[in-house]
A protein has these predicted regions:
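C-terminal edge and immediately downstream basic/flexible tail or linker adjoining helix-turn-helix-like DNA-binding
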Residues: 1-8, 12-13, 24, 132-135, ...
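Short, small-hydrophobic-rich alpha-helical interface motif
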Residues: 25, 40, 44, 48, ...
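Short, charged helix-capping/linker segments at alpha-helix termini
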Residues: 3-5, 26-35, 45-64, 169, ...
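Helix-turn-helix DNA-binding module
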Residues: 135-138, 142-146, 150, 154-171
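Arg/Lys-rich amphipathic alpha helix in sigma70-family domain 2
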Residues: 71-78, 88-107, 126, 178
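Internal acidic/polar
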Residues: 2-7, 14-18, 96, 101-130
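Sigma70-family region 2
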Residues: 26-27, 53, 63-81, 99-101
Length: 195
């Protein structure tokens, strides 16, 4: 067997490799599942952060999602990318969790790494802008917010988002249009030019 196809961690780096991993998971390969888990845990965490804003809920949804991947790997038919299939599971689980979870959204400050330490004014401005964007995103309806973040933060196509959210592509286009329009209004005056 080719050493590249024998290493699950290497397979998790390409769409074709991910599909191979899902096939191996369906056959009970724990190493393949571990590789997929490691690849998707942080991606799903970032996706769900902007949806739920609850660390405990995020971890629970990610784990539930990946457990569903383990259990239902045999049902993956290859009609979409593995990422689309997994994000769709996470989206549905998050929607269910949010309906059952009636707690206020946490507006805590995120720790930002890699900020230019020599320029405190830039660091402050970056944090201010990040909070403004987060606050504006939080005001969008869940469907618009989800479509927008899948486009912006996860670089997914409208067709992939439509698969994840189980709706027509035109609905995604409309949601993105309204999200951009609303964000432009909410962020008007927030962006300042630096000298």
């Amino acid at each position: 067997m080719d050493s590249r196809t024998d290493d699950p961690a290497l397979l998790a780096r390409t769409a074709e490799g991910e599909a191979c991993l899902v096939g191996r998971i369906a056959a009970g390969d724990r190493r393949a599942f571990e590789a997929l888990y490691r690849a998707y845990f942080p991606r799903l965490g970032r996706f769900l952060q902007r949806m739920t804003r609850s660390s405990a809920l995020i971890e629970e949804i990610v784990n539930d999602t990946l457990l569903a991947v383990w259990r239902k790997a045999g049902t993956f038919d290859g009609s979409s990318k593995v990422s689309t299939w997994i994000f769709a599971i996470a989206y549905r689980r998050a929607c269910k969790a949010l309906q059952a979870f009636d707690e206020p959204v946490d507006a805590g400050i995120d720790e930002r790494e890699g900020v230019d330490a020599d320029r405190p004014d830039w660091q402050f401005e970056r944090l201010r802008l990040a909070h403004a964007v987060d606050a504006a995103l939080a005001q969008l309806p869940l469907a618009q917010r989800t479509a927008f973040q899948l486009t912006l933060y996860h670089d997914m196509s409208q067709a992939e988002i439509a698969d994840i959210m189980a709706c027509p592509v035109n609905t995604i286009k409309t949601r993105l249009f309204h999200a951009r329009k609303r964000l432009a209004l909410l962020l008007d005056g927030q962006l300042e030019e630096r000298p």
